Amino acid sequence: MQTRDLPWRAKSLKGVHEKMLWRDESTEATIALIKFEKGAGIPQPHLHASNQFMFCLEGRYEYTATGVVLTPGSFYCNPKGNVHGPTIAHEETVVVEMYDGPHYPVKPDWYSDEKDAH
């Protein structure tokens, strides 16, 4: 698979796009490329139903409550149940995002499309 050949799918949260690379339907584990336009991010503190792993390929992405900033080459883990966020992309940012199970216990309010929470 050449990721450059896959189209970006706009999520229902403005400025956020994804390329789903792999998904296990039985466990809901995923690997995806996520692109945040400059100024986009997750607007509220939240938690995940599984472990979330992020590897930054390009840009600058900040967890504003803690000041953690991802830049190219940064790896970050949000353990299952750990409250984190909000976040903001200070420039266009692309990350590899991996979950080892379902993304959210329930669909967050900032997504109007149920598919965006999986």
Describe each PLM feature range.
Residues 1-28, 111-118:
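A short, N-terminal "cap"/entry segment at the start of jelly-roll beta-barrel domains
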Residues 38, 47-64:
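Glycine- and acidic-residue-biased ligand/ion/polar-headgroup-sensing regions
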Residues 17-22, 27-47, 79-83:
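Conserved short histidine dyad/triad with adjacent acidic residue
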Residues 64-83:
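Short acidic-glycine-tyrosine-enriched beta hairpin
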Residues 29-31, 51, 93-94:
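Structural motif
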